[in-house]
Amino acid sequence: MGEELKTLKRTCMCGGLTEANIGDKITVMGWVQRKRNLGGLVFVDLRDRTGILQIVFGEAINKEAFEKSDSVKSEYCIAAVGTIVKRESPNMEIPTGMVELKGEYIKIFSESETPPIYIKENLDAAENIRLKYRYLDLRRPDMQRIFMLRHKTAKVIRDFLDEQGFLEIETPILGKSTPEGARDYLVPSRNYKGKYYALPQSPQLFKQLLMVSGYDRYFQIAKCFRDEDLRANRQPEFTQVDMEISFVDQEEVMDLNERLIQRVFKQILDVDVKLPIERMTYKTAMDKYGSDKPDLRFGMEINDISEVVKGVDFKVFQNALENGGSVRAIKVTGSAALGRKQLDKLVEFVKTYGASGLIWMAYKKEGIKCSISKFLTEEDTQNILNKMEAAEGDLILIVADKNKVVFESLGALRIHMAKQTGILEGNNDFKFVWITEFPLLSYNEEENRYQAEHHPFVMPMDEDIQYLESNPEKVRAKAYDIVLNGEELGGGSIRIHDTKLQEKMFGAIGISKDTAWNKFGYFLEALKFGPPPHGGLAYGFDRMIMFLAGTDNIKDVIAFPKNQNAFCPLTEAPNSVDKSQLKDLGIEVK
Protein backbone atom coordinates (compact mmCIF):
# COMPACT_ATOMS: atom_id res chain seq x y z
CA MET A 1 0.00 0.00 0.00
CA GLY A 2 1.49 3.30 -1.07
CA GLU A 3 1.93 6.22 1.28
CA GLU A 4 -0.10 9.41 0.97
CA LEU A 5 1.29 12.84 0.19
CA LYS A 6 -0.39 14.39 3.27
CA THR A 7 1.44 17.61 4.26
CA LEU A 8 4.60 16.91 2.24
CA LYS A 9 5.23 19.56 -0.44
CA ARG A 10 7.66 19.40 -3.33
CA THR A 11 9.98 22.40 -3.13
CA CYS A 12 11.94 22.02 -6.36
CA MET A 13 12.51 19.87 -9.44
CA CYS A 14 15.42 17.47 -9.82
CA GLY A 15 17.13 18.79 -12.93
CA GLY A 16 17.94 22.36 -11.95
CA LEU A 17 20.04 21.89 -8.82
CA THR A 18 23.63 23.17 -8.91
CA GLU A 19 26.46 24.15 -6.57
CA ALA A 20 24.53 27.36 -5.88
CA ASN A 21 22.01 25.20 -3.97
CA ILE A 22 24.56 23.62 -1.59
CA GLY A 23 23.17 23.81 1.94
CA ASP A 24 19.55 24.08 0.82
CA LYS A 25 17.00 21.86 2.57
CA ILE A 26 14.71 20.56 -0.16
CA THR A 27 11.98 18.06 -1.00
CA VAL A 28 12.03 16.34 -4.40
CA MET A 29 9.55 13.89 -5.92
CA GLY A 30 9.76 11.62 -8.92
CA TRP A 31 10.63 8.14 -10.17
CA VAL A 32 13.58 5.91 -9.33
CA GLN A 33 15.85 5.60 -12.36
CA ARG A 34 18.13 3.14 -10.56
CA LYS A 35 19.33 2.15 -7.08
CA ARG A 36 22.78 0.96 -5.93
CA ASN A 37 23.53 -0.51 -2.48
CA LEU A 38 27.20 -0.10 -1.56
CA GLY A 39 26.98 -1.53 1.94
CA GLY A 40 26.68 1.39 4.31
CA LEU A 41 25.30 3.67 1.60
CA VAL A 42 22.34 3.44 -0.81
CA PHE A 43 22.43 5.64 -3.92
CA VAL A 44 19.15 6.44 -5.66
CA ASP A 45 18.96 8.30 -8.98
CA LEU A 46 15.66 10.18 -8.87
CA ARG A 47 14.13 11.35 -12.15
CA ASP A 48 11.46 13.88 -12.99
CA ARG A 49 10.77 15.66 -16.28
CA THR A 50 13.58 18.15 -15.69
CA GLY A 51 16.40 15.66 -15.13
CA ILE A 52 18.09 13.34 -12.62
CA LEU A 53 19.38 13.98 -9.10
CA GLN A 54 21.51 11.52 -7.12
CA ILE A 55 20.31 10.93 -3.54
CA VAL A 56 22.54 9.23 -0.98
CA PHE A 57 21.02 7.49 2.04
CA GLY A 58 23.26 6.22 4.85
CA GLU A 59 23.03 4.78 8.33
CA ALA A 60 25.01 7.74 9.62
CA ILE A 61 22.61 10.18 7.94
CA ASN A 62 19.28 8.65 8.96
CA LYS A 63 19.00 4.95 9.76
CA GLU A 64 15.24 4.69 9.10
CA ALA A 65 15.51 6.42 5.73
CA PHE A 66 18.56 4.29 4.84
CA GLU A 67 16.74 1.01 5.54
CA LYS A 68 13.61 2.12 3.72
CA SER A 69 15.58 3.32 0.69
CA ASP A 70 17.00 -0.16 0.17
CA SER A 71 13.49 -1.45 -0.61
CA VAL A 72 12.92 0.78 -3.63
CA LYS A 73 13.28 -0.46 -7.20
CA SER A 74 13.27 1.09 -10.66
CA GLU A 75 10.18 3.22 -11.42
CA TYR A 76 8.97 3.36 -7.82
CA CYS A 77 7.38 6.77 -7.27
CA ILE A 78 8.92 8.39 -4.19
CA ALA A 79 9.67 11.61 -2.33
CA ALA A 80 12.95 12.44 -0.61
CA VAL A 81 13.81 15.17 1.87
CA GLY A 82 17.34 16.27 2.66
CA THR A 83 20.16 18.75 2.17
CA ILE A 84 22.07 19.49 -1.03
CA VAL A 85 25.80 18.78 -0.64
CA LYS A 86 28.83 18.80 -2.93
CA ARG A 87 29.29 15.46 -4.66
CA GLU A 88 32.53 13.63 -3.85
CA SER A 89 32.69 12.01 -7.31
CA PRO A 90 31.16 14.46 -9.82
CA ASN A 91 29.27 13.18 -12.87
CA MET A 92 29.91 15.64 -15.68
CA GLU A 93 27.41 13.88 -17.99
CA ILE A 94 24.37 15.34 -16.19
CA PRO A 95 23.61 18.98 -15.26
CA THR A 96 23.25 18.10 -11.56
CA GLY A 97 26.47 16.10 -11.52
CA MET A 98 28.33 18.42 -9.10
CA VAL A 99 25.84 17.93 -6.26
CA GLU A 100 23.75 15.28 -4.53
CA LEU A 101 20.99 15.15 -1.95
CA LYS A 102 21.87 13.82 1.50
CA GLY A 103 18.67 11.83 2.11
CA GLU A 104 17.17 12.32 5.57
CA TYR A 105 13.62 11.13 4.83
CA ILE A 106 11.93 9.01 2.15
CA LYS A 107 8.29 8.37 1.33
CA ILE A 108 7.18 5.68 -1.14
CA PHE A 109 4.01 6.77 -2.93
CA SER A 110 3.70 3.66 -5.10
CA GLU A 111 5.62 0.62 -6.22
CA SER A 112 6.19 -0.50 -9.80
CA GLU A 113 6.27 -3.83 -11.55
CA THR A 114 9.25 -4.46 -13.83
CA PRO A 115 8.53 -2.19 -16.83
CA PRO A 116 8.10 -3.92 -20.23
CA ILE A 117 10.32 -1.23 -21.78
CA TYR A 118 13.42 0.50 -20.46
CA ILE A 119 12.95 4.10 -19.35
CA LYS A 120 16.03 5.45 -21.11
CA GLU A 121 17.17 7.61 -24.01
CA ASN A 122 17.28 6.25 -27.58
CA LEU A 123 15.15 3.23 -26.77
CA ASP A 124 15.34 0.41 -29.31
CA ALA A 125 11.98 -1.32 -28.84
CA ALA A 126 9.18 -2.48 -31.13
CA GLU A 127 6.85 0.41 -31.97
CA ASN A 128 3.67 -1.42 -30.96
CA ILE A 129 5.16 -2.21 -27.53
CA ARG A 130 6.06 1.46 -27.09
CA LEU A 131 2.52 2.48 -28.07
CA LYS A 132 0.86 -0.16 -25.88
CA TYR A 133 2.79 1.13 -22.85
CA ARG A 134 2.85 4.73 -24.02
CA TYR A 135 2.57 6.10 -20.47
CA LEU A 136 5.95 4.46 -19.77
CA ASP A 137 7.42 5.49 -23.13
CA LEU A 138 6.48 9.09 -22.33
CA ARG A 139 8.56 8.97 -19.14
CA ARG A 140 11.73 8.72 -21.22
CA PRO A 141 13.81 11.93 -21.14
CA ASP A 142 14.02 12.28 -24.93
CA MET A 143 10.23 12.03 -25.21
CA GLN A 144 9.69 14.52 -22.40
CA ARG A 145 12.03 17.00 -24.10
CA ILE A 146 9.90 16.76 -27.24
CA PHE A 147 6.68 17.57 -25.41
CA MET A 148 8.26 20.44 -23.50
CA LEU A 149 9.47 21.74 -26.88
CA ARG A 150 5.97 21.29 -28.31
CA HIS A 151 4.48 23.32 -25.46
CA LYS A 152 7.08 26.06 -25.84
CA THR A 153 6.53 26.24 -29.61
CA ALA A 154 2.77 26.60 -29.17
CA LYS A 155 3.39 29.40 -26.67
CA VAL A 156 5.78 31.24 -29.03
CA ILE A 157 3.18 31.02 -31.80
CA ARG A 158 0.36 32.22 -29.54
CA ASP A 159 2.45 35.11 -28.22
CA PHE A 160 3.47 36.22 -31.73
CA LEU A 161 -0.06 36.10 -33.13
CA ASP A 162 -1.40 37.89 -30.06
CA GLU A 163 1.15 40.67 -30.66
CA GLN A 164 -0.13 40.89 -34.25
CA GLY A 165 -3.72 41.41 -33.14
CA PHE A 166 -5.06 37.91 -33.70
CA LEU A 167 -7.94 36.42 -31.71
CA GLU A 168 -7.87 32.74 -30.77
CA ILE A 169 -11.35 31.39 -31.53
CA GLU A 170 -12.46 27.76 -31.40
CA THR A 171 -14.57 26.32 -34.22
CA PRO A 172 -16.91 23.29 -34.07
CA ILE A 173 -15.70 19.71 -33.97
CA LEU A 174 -19.12 18.34 -34.95
CA GLY A 175 -19.77 19.69 -38.42
CA LYS A 176 -21.34 18.92 -41.78
CA SER A 177 -19.98 16.26 -44.13
CA THR A 178 -18.85 17.62 -47.49
CA PRO A 179 -17.38 14.64 -49.38
CA GLU A 180 -14.62 16.42 -51.29
CA GLY A 181 -11.07 15.12 -50.92
CA ALA A 182 -10.27 12.72 -48.09
CA ARG A 183 -12.98 10.70 -46.35
CA ASP A 184 -14.67 12.22 -43.33
CA TYR A 185 -14.91 10.61 -39.93
CA LEU A 186 -18.65 10.37 -39.36
CA VAL A 187 -20.49 10.64 -36.03
CA PRO A 188 -24.09 9.32 -35.98
CA SER A 189 -26.71 11.57 -34.40
CA ARG A 190 -29.00 10.15 -31.70
CA ASN A 191 -31.53 12.96 -32.08
CA TYR A 192 -31.62 12.86 -35.88
CA LYS A 193 -31.56 9.17 -36.73
CA GLY A 194 -29.96 8.36 -40.06
CA LYS A 195 -28.03 11.63 -40.07
CA TYR A 196 -24.39 12.22 -39.25
CA TYR A 197 -21.97 14.86 -38.13
CA ALA A 198 -18.48 14.92 -39.63
CA LEU A 199 -15.29 15.61 -37.72
CA PRO A 200 -13.44 18.53 -39.36
CA GLN A 201 -10.66 17.93 -41.87
CA SER A 202 -9.84 21.59 -41.29
CA PRO A 203 -11.68 24.65 -39.92
CA GLN A 204 -11.74 26.08 -43.48
CA LEU A 205 -15.30 27.31 -43.88
CA PHE A 206 -15.79 28.34 -40.26
CA LYS A 207 -12.69 30.51 -40.32
CA GLN A 208 -13.91 32.15 -43.53
CA LEU A 209 -17.27 32.76 -41.84
CA LEU A 210 -15.39 34.45 -38.99
CA MET A 211 -13.96 36.87 -41.58
CA VAL A 212 -17.51 37.56 -42.80
CA SER A 213 -18.36 38.15 -39.12
CA GLY A 214 -15.78 40.93 -38.91
CA TYR A 215 -13.16 39.32 -36.67
CA ASP A 216 -10.33 40.35 -39.05
CA ARG A 217 -7.58 38.17 -37.57
CA TYR A 218 -8.32 34.66 -36.32
CA PHE A 219 -6.11 31.78 -35.27
CA GLN A 220 -6.55 28.42 -33.64
CA ILE A 221 -4.38 25.44 -32.78
CA ALA A 222 -6.94 23.02 -34.11
CA LYS A 223 -7.44 19.27 -34.02
CA CYS A 224 -8.29 17.88 -37.47
CA PHE A 225 -9.35 14.44 -38.71
CA ARG A 226 -9.01 12.54 -42.00
CA ASP A 227 -10.12 8.98 -42.62
CA GLU A 228 -7.48 8.16 -45.20
CA ASP A 229 -5.03 5.35 -45.81
CA LEU A 230 -2.07 6.11 -43.59
CA ARG A 231 1.21 6.68 -45.34
CA ALA A 232 4.41 7.28 -43.44
CA ASN A 233 4.11 10.23 -41.09
CA ARG A 234 0.33 10.55 -41.38
CA GLN A 235 -2.11 10.24 -38.52
CA PRO A 236 -5.93 10.06 -38.60
CA GLU A 237 -6.05 12.95 -36.11
CA PHE A 238 -3.52 15.75 -36.29
CA THR A 239 -3.00 19.34 -35.24
CA GLN A 240 -2.93 22.49 -37.37
CA VAL A 241 -1.91 26.03 -36.57
CA ASP A 242 -4.73 27.68 -38.48
CA MET A 243 -5.16 31.35 -39.28
CA GLU A 244 -7.21 33.71 -41.43
CA ILE A 245 -6.83 37.44 -42.09
CA SER A 246 -9.14 40.02 -43.69
CA PHE A 247 -8.15 42.83 -46.08
CA VAL A 248 -4.80 41.33 -47.11
CA ASP A 249 -3.14 40.20 -50.29
CA GLN A 250 -0.89 37.19 -50.78
CA GLU A 251 2.36 39.02 -50.00
CA GLU A 252 1.02 40.32 -46.69
CA VAL A 253 0.06 36.80 -45.56
CA MET A 254 3.46 35.46 -46.60
CA ASP A 255 5.33 38.33 -44.93
CA LEU A 256 3.56 37.83 -41.60
CA ASN A 257 4.12 34.09 -41.67
CA GLU A 258 7.79 34.22 -42.47
CA ARG A 259 8.22 36.55 -39.50
CA LEU A 260 6.37 33.96 -37.42
CA ILE A 261 8.72 31.24 -38.70
CA GLN A 262 11.71 33.44 -37.94
CA ARG A 263 10.48 33.95 -34.35
CA VAL A 264 9.81 30.23 -33.78
CA PHE A 265 13.18 29.02 -35.08
CA LYS A 266 15.07 31.72 -33.18
CA GLN A 267 13.37 31.12 -29.83
CA ILE A 268 13.23 27.33 -30.04
CA LEU A 269 16.51 26.45 -31.80
CA ASP A 270 18.43 29.75 -31.76
CA VAL A 271 18.53 29.50 -35.57
CA ASP A 272 18.43 32.72 -37.59
CA VAL A 273 16.08 32.49 -40.58
CA LYS A 274 17.06 35.10 -43.15
CA LEU A 275 14.17 37.13 -44.58
CA PRO A 276 12.64 37.43 -47.06
CA ILE A 277 12.32 33.70 -47.72
CA GLU A 278 12.94 32.76 -51.35
CA ARG A 279 9.89 32.70 -53.66
CA MET A 280 9.62 30.10 -56.44
CA THR A 281 6.73 29.45 -58.82
CA TYR A 282 5.21 26.00 -59.09
CA LYS A 283 6.40 25.77 -62.70
CA THR A 284 10.00 26.56 -61.76
CA ALA A 285 9.91 24.06 -58.90
CA MET A 286 8.65 21.29 -61.18
CA ASP A 287 11.05 22.16 -64.00
CA LYS A 288 14.14 22.26 -61.77
CA TYR A 289 13.33 19.80 -58.99
CA GLY A 290 10.44 17.64 -60.21
CA SER A 291 8.48 18.47 -57.07
CA ASP A 292 6.33 21.23 -55.61
CA LYS A 293 8.17 20.53 -52.35
CA PRO A 294 11.80 21.00 -53.44
CA ASP A 295 14.69 20.26 -51.10
CA LEU A 296 17.11 23.13 -51.69
CA ARG A 297 19.89 21.82 -49.45
CA PHE A 298 21.59 20.38 -52.54
CA GLY A 299 21.70 20.97 -56.28
CA MET A 300 21.29 18.06 -58.72
CA GLU A 301 18.73 20.11 -60.66
CA ILE A 302 16.72 18.62 -63.50
CA ASN A 303 17.78 19.75 -66.97
CA ASP A 304 15.59 19.68 -70.07
CA ILE A 305 17.70 18.09 -72.81
CA SER A 306 14.82 17.72 -75.31
CA GLU A 307 16.36 20.14 -77.82
CA VAL A 308 19.72 18.40 -77.63
CA VAL A 309 18.30 14.94 -78.36
CA LYS A 310 15.43 15.75 -80.74
CA GLY A 311 17.49 14.53 -83.71
CA VAL A 312 18.71 11.36 -82.02
CA ASP A 313 17.53 8.16 -83.72
CA PHE A 314 16.18 6.56 -80.54
CA LYS A 315 12.49 5.64 -80.46
CA VAL A 316 12.01 6.30 -76.72
CA PHE A 317 13.17 9.91 -77.18
CA GLN A 318 11.12 10.37 -80.35
CA ASN A 319 7.91 8.95 -78.87
CA ALA A 320 8.17 11.14 -75.78
CA LEU A 321 8.69 14.31 -77.82
CA GLU A 322 6.03 13.49 -80.43
CA ASN A 323 3.45 12.92 -77.68
CA GLY A 324 4.08 16.27 -76.02
CA GLY A 325 6.44 14.95 -73.38
CA SER A 326 10.09 15.72 -72.78
CA VAL A 327 13.54 14.27 -72.19
CA ARG A 328 15.14 15.44 -68.96
CA ALA A 329 18.15 14.49 -66.87
CA ILE A 330 19.97 14.93 -63.58
CA LYS A 331 23.72 14.87 -62.95
CA VAL A 332 24.99 12.91 -59.95
CA THR A 333 28.48 14.18 -59.21
CA GLY A 334 31.11 11.53 -58.53
CA SER A 335 28.83 8.54 -59.11
CA ALA A 336 30.12 7.25 -62.45
CA ALA A 337 31.57 4.20 -60.69
CA LEU A 338 28.15 2.76 -59.80
CA GLY A 339 27.97 -0.92 -60.80
CA ARG A 340 25.48 -2.50 -63.17
CA LYS A 341 23.40 -4.01 -60.36
CA GLN A 342 23.08 -0.61 -58.70
CA LEU A 343 22.11 1.00 -62.00
CA ASP A 344 19.51 -1.71 -62.65
CA LYS A 345 17.99 -0.92 -59.24
CA LEU A 346 17.70 2.72 -60.29
CA VAL A 347 15.86 1.63 -63.43
CA GLU A 348 13.37 -0.29 -61.29
CA PHE A 349 13.10 2.69 -58.94
CA VAL A 350 11.86 5.09 -61.64
CA LYS A 351 9.44 2.47 -62.96
CA THR A 352 7.56 2.68 -59.66
CA TYR A 353 6.76 6.28 -60.65
CA GLY A 354 5.38 5.27 -64.04
CA ALA A 355 8.53 5.76 -66.13
CA SER A 356 9.09 3.20 -68.88
CA GLY A 357 12.80 3.13 -68.11
CA LEU A 358 15.97 5.02 -67.23
CA ILE A 359 18.92 5.85 -69.45
CA TRP A 360 22.29 6.24 -67.77
CA MET A 361 25.56 7.74 -68.98
CA ALA A 362 28.74 7.36 -66.91
CA TYR A 363 31.68 9.71 -67.57
CA LYS A 364 34.64 7.50 -66.63
CA LYS A 365 38.37 8.01 -66.98
CA GLU A 366 38.57 5.35 -69.66
CA GLY A 367 35.67 6.85 -71.62
CA ILE A 368 31.89 7.22 -71.71
CA LYS A 369 29.71 4.25 -70.79
CA CYS A 370 26.04 4.55 -71.76
CA SER A 371 23.01 2.24 -71.66
CA ILE A 372 21.98 3.37 -75.19
CA SER A 373 25.44 3.90 -76.69
CA LYS A 374 24.48 2.09 -79.91
CA PHE A 375 21.83 4.75 -80.63
CA LEU A 376 24.11 7.74 -79.99
CA THR A 377 26.76 9.22 -82.20
CA GLU A 378 29.88 10.64 -80.58
CA GLU A 379 28.44 14.10 -81.26
CA ASP A 380 25.12 13.19 -79.59
CA THR A 381 26.97 11.98 -76.51
CA GLN A 382 29.10 15.10 -76.33
CA ASN A 383 26.06 17.36 -76.75
CA ILE A 384 24.36 15.71 -73.77
CA LEU A 385 27.51 15.98 -71.65
CA ASN A 386 27.93 19.64 -72.59
CA LYS A 387 24.28 20.43 -71.80
CA MET A 388 24.68 18.75 -68.41
CA GLU A 389 28.06 20.43 -67.77
CA ALA A 390 29.39 16.97 -66.91
CA ALA A 391 32.94 16.24 -65.79
CA GLU A 392 34.89 13.05 -65.30
CA GLY A 393 33.33 10.96 -62.53
CA ASP A 394 29.77 12.20 -63.12
CA LEU A 395 26.71 10.04 -63.76
CA ILE A 396 23.90 11.31 -65.99
CA LEU A 397 20.42 9.82 -65.45
CA ILE A 398 17.80 10.44 -68.15
CA VAL A 399 14.03 9.88 -68.34
CA ALA A 400 11.93 10.35 -71.49
CA ASP A 401 8.15 10.25 -71.07
CA LYS A 402 5.06 12.38 -70.45
CA ASN A 403 6.02 15.47 -68.47
CA LYS A 404 4.08 14.37 -65.38
CA VAL A 405 5.96 11.06 -65.32
CA VAL A 406 9.31 12.71 -66.04
CA PHE A 407 8.92 15.21 -63.21
CA GLU A 408 7.69 12.69 -60.65
CA SER A 409 10.29 10.03 -61.45
CA LEU A 410 13.30 12.38 -61.69
CA GLY A 411 12.14 14.37 -58.67
CA ALA A 412 12.00 11.18 -56.61
CA LEU A 413 15.27 9.91 -58.11
CA ARG A 414 16.97 13.19 -57.18
CA ILE A 415 16.06 12.69 -53.50
CA HIS A 416 16.96 8.98 -53.69
CA MET A 417 20.43 9.74 -55.09
CA ALA A 418 21.02 12.44 -52.48
CA LYS A 419 20.38 9.86 -49.77
CA GLN A 420 22.37 7.15 -51.53
CA THR A 421 25.42 9.34 -52.06
CA GLY A 422 25.26 10.76 -48.54
CA ILE A 423 25.42 14.40 -49.61
CA LEU A 424 22.91 15.33 -46.89
CA GLU A 425 24.75 13.58 -44.06
CA GLY A 426 25.62 16.10 -41.39
CA ASN A 427 23.68 18.81 -43.22
CA ASN A 428 21.78 20.68 -40.51
CA ASP A 429 20.66 23.56 -42.73
CA PHE A 430 17.06 24.76 -42.79
CA LYS A 431 16.23 25.72 -46.38
CA PHE A 432 12.87 27.44 -46.65
CA VAL A 433 11.12 28.36 -49.89
CA TRP A 434 7.67 29.70 -50.77
CA ILE A 435 6.03 27.91 -53.71
CA THR A 436 3.48 30.09 -55.53
CA GLU A 437 1.25 30.14 -58.63
CA PHE A 438 -0.02 26.58 -58.25
CA PRO A 439 -2.47 25.25 -60.83
CA LEU A 440 -5.97 25.96 -59.55
CA LEU A 441 -7.33 22.70 -60.98
CA SER A 442 -6.08 19.34 -62.18
CA TYR A 443 -7.86 16.75 -64.31
CA ASN A 444 -8.92 13.51 -62.65
CA GLU A 445 -8.95 10.92 -65.44
CA GLU A 446 -10.64 8.27 -63.28
CA GLU A 447 -13.59 10.54 -62.44
CA ASN A 448 -13.45 12.33 -65.80
CA ARG A 449 -13.60 15.79 -64.24
CA TYR A 450 -11.46 18.61 -62.91
CA GLN A 451 -10.72 18.78 -59.21
CA ALA A 452 -9.34 21.51 -56.97
CA GLU A 453 -5.59 21.21 -56.38
CA HIS A 454 -5.95 22.66 -52.88
CA HIS A 455 -9.67 23.15 -52.13
CA PRO A 456 -12.62 24.79 -53.93
CA PHE A 457 -12.39 28.11 -52.06
CA VAL A 458 -9.07 29.32 -53.51
CA MET A 459 -9.11 32.55 -55.50
CA PRO A 460 -7.82 32.27 -59.09
CA MET A 461 -5.16 34.75 -60.16
CA ASP A 462 -6.86 37.87 -61.51
CA GLU A 463 -5.52 37.53 -65.06
CA ASP A 464 -6.56 33.86 -65.25
CA ILE A 465 -10.22 34.07 -64.12
CA GLN A 466 -11.24 34.49 -67.78
CA TYR A 467 -10.05 30.92 -68.49
CA LEU A 468 -11.95 29.21 -65.65
CA GLU A 469 -14.63 27.81 -67.97
CA SER A 470 -12.85 27.76 -71.33
CA ASN A 471 -9.37 26.49 -70.37
CA PRO A 472 -9.33 25.41 -66.70
CA GLU A 473 -5.83 23.91 -66.76
CA LYS A 474 -4.41 27.33 -67.62
CA VAL A 475 -5.74 28.93 -64.43
CA ARG A 476 -3.24 29.59 -61.65
CA ALA A 477 -4.23 29.96 -58.02
CA LYS A 478 -3.48 32.63 -55.45
CA ALA A 479 -2.05 29.83 -53.35
CA TYR A 480 1.24 29.51 -51.52
CA ASP A 481 3.01 26.71 -49.66
CA ILE A 482 5.92 27.12 -47.28
CA VAL A 483 8.39 24.28 -47.84
CA LEU A 484 11.28 23.29 -45.60
CA ASN A 485 13.95 20.80 -46.68
CA GLY A 486 11.62 19.06 -49.13
CA GLU A 487 8.60 18.90 -46.81
CA GLU A 488 5.49 21.05 -46.84
CA LEU A 489 5.40 22.93 -43.55
CA GLY A 490 2.22 24.83 -44.30
CA GLY A 491 0.01 26.10 -47.05
CA GLY A 492 -2.60 28.72 -47.70
CA SER A 493 -4.34 30.92 -50.22
CA ILE A 494 -6.36 34.02 -50.84
CA ARG A 495 -10.03 32.98 -50.80
CA ILE A 496 -12.95 33.62 -53.11
CA HIS A 497 -15.26 36.22 -51.54
CA ASP A 498 -17.87 36.48 -54.27
CA THR A 499 -20.91 34.18 -54.50
CA LYS A 500 -21.02 34.07 -58.30
CA LEU A 501 -17.32 33.32 -58.64
CA GLN A 502 -17.63 30.64 -55.96
CA GLU A 503 -20.52 29.05 -57.88
CA LYS A 504 -18.44 29.21 -61.05
CA MET A 505 -15.56 27.49 -59.23
CA PHE A 506 -17.89 24.71 -58.07
CA GLY A 507 -19.09 24.33 -61.66
CA ALA A 508 -15.51 23.97 -62.89
CA ILE A 509 -15.03 20.92 -60.65
CA GLY A 510 -18.30 19.29 -61.67
CA ILE A 511 -20.49 20.44 -58.78
CA SER A 512 -23.81 21.77 -60.07
CA LYS A 513 -25.38 24.90 -58.64
CA ASP A 514 -28.08 22.85 -56.89
CA THR A 515 -25.53 20.45 -55.39
CA ALA A 516 -23.33 23.35 -54.30
CA TRP A 517 -26.22 25.02 -52.49
CA ASN A 518 -27.23 21.72 -50.91
CA LYS A 519 -23.71 21.09 -49.58
CA PHE A 520 -22.47 24.62 -48.96
CA GLY A 521 -25.63 26.72 -48.92
CA TYR A 522 -24.93 28.27 -45.52
CA PHE A 523 -21.54 29.44 -46.78
CA LEU A 524 -22.76 30.71 -50.16
CA GLU A 525 -25.53 32.57 -48.32
CA ALA A 526 -22.94 34.24 -46.08
CA LEU A 527 -21.05 35.47 -49.14
CA LYS A 528 -24.09 37.62 -49.98
CA PHE A 529 -23.60 39.77 -46.88
CA GLY A 530 -20.51 41.87 -47.46
CA PRO A 531 -17.62 39.41 -47.14
CA PRO A 532 -14.19 41.08 -47.00
CA PRO A 533 -11.25 40.05 -49.17
CA HIS A 534 -9.40 37.52 -47.03
CA GLY A 535 -6.79 34.81 -46.99
CA GLY A 536 -4.97 32.56 -44.62
CA LEU A 537 -2.63 29.70 -43.99
CA ALA A 538 -2.39 26.53 -41.93
CA TYR A 539 0.71 24.77 -40.65
CA GLY A 540 0.97 21.10 -39.88
CA PHE A 541 1.91 21.61 -36.23
CA ASP A 542 3.02 18.01 -35.74
CA ARG A 543 5.34 18.25 -38.74
CA MET A 544 6.71 21.56 -37.48
CA ILE A 545 7.57 19.90 -34.16
CA MET A 546 9.26 17.03 -36.03
CA PHE A 547 11.63 19.53 -37.65
CA LEU A 548 12.29 21.37 -34.41
CA ALA A 549 12.83 18.15 -32.44
CA GLY A 550 14.96 16.51 -35.13
CA THR A 551 12.84 13.37 -35.49
CA ASP A 552 11.54 11.77 -38.67
CA ASN A 553 8.68 9.92 -36.94
CA ILE A 554 5.39 11.76 -36.42
CA LYS A 555 4.45 9.37 -33.61
CA ASP A 556 7.31 10.81 -31.55
CA VAL A 557 5.61 14.23 -31.39
CA ILE A 558 2.04 13.13 -30.61
CA ALA A 559 1.40 12.05 -27.03
CA PHE A 560 -0.98 9.18 -27.81
CA PRO A 561 -0.74 8.38 -31.54
CA LYS A 562 -2.34 5.62 -33.59
CA ASN A 563 -0.27 3.01 -35.43
CA GLN A 564 -0.08 2.56 -39.22
CA ASN A 565 -3.48 0.85 -39.16
CA ALA A 566 -5.17 3.75 -37.33
CA PHE A 567 -5.36 1.53 -34.23
CA CYS A 568 -4.42 2.52 -30.69
CA PRO A 569 -2.52 -0.36 -29.03
CA LEU A 570 -2.93 1.37 -25.65
CA THR A 571 -6.72 1.72 -25.52
CA GLU A 572 -7.50 -0.77 -28.31
CA ALA A 573 -9.60 1.82 -30.12
CA PRO A 574 -11.58 1.49 -32.29
CA ASN A 575 -13.63 -1.04 -30.36
CA SER A 576 -17.05 -2.70 -30.45
CA VAL A 577 -19.85 -0.99 -28.53
CA ASP A 578 -22.94 -2.26 -26.73
CA LYS A 579 -25.96 -3.07 -28.86
CA SER A 580 -27.98 -0.71 -26.66
CA GLN A 581 -25.75 2.17 -27.76
CA LEU A 582 -26.25 1.27 -31.41
CA LYS A 583 -30.00 0.96 -30.86
CA ASP A 584 -30.12 4.50 -29.46
CA LEU A 585 -28.46 5.66 -32.67
CA GLY A 586 -30.72 3.62 -34.94
CA ILE A 587 -27.76 1.63 -36.24
CA GLU A 588 -27.70 -2.09 -36.95
CA VAL A 589 -24.41 -3.82 -37.74
CA LYS A 590 -24.79 -6.82 -40.03
Swiss-Prot record:
Binding site for ATP: 226-228, 235, 488, 540-543
Catalytic activity of the protein: tRNA(Asp) + L-aspartate + ATP = L-aspartyl-tRNA(Asp) + AMP + diphosphate
Keywords recorded for this protein, A-Z: Aminoacyl-tRNA synthetase, ATP-binding, Cytoplasm, Ligase, Nucleotide-binding, Protein biosynthesis
Gene that this sequence comes from: aspS
InterPro entries (alphabetical): Aa-tRNA-synt_II, aa-tRNA-synth_II, aa-tRNA-synth_II/BPL/LPL, Asp-tRNA-ligase_1, Asp-tRNA-ligase_1_N, Asp/Asn-tRNA-synth_IIb, AspRS_core, GAD-like_sf
Entry similarity comment: Belongs to the class-II aminoacyl-tRNA synthetase family. Type 1 subfamily.
Alphabetized Pfam families for the sequence: GAD (PF02938), tRNA-synt_2 (PF00152), tRNA_anti-codon (PF01336)
Residues of the signal peptide: none
Annotated PROSITE patterns: AA_TRNA_LIGASE_II
GO MF, one example: transferase activity
Region of interest (Aspartate), residue spans: 204-207
Protein EC: 6.1.1.12
Role, per record: Catalyzes the attachment of L-aspartate to tRNA(Asp) in a two-step reaction: L-aspartate is first activated by ATP to form Asp-AMP and then transferred to the acceptor end of tRNA(Asp).
Protein's recorded name: Aspartate--tRNA ligase
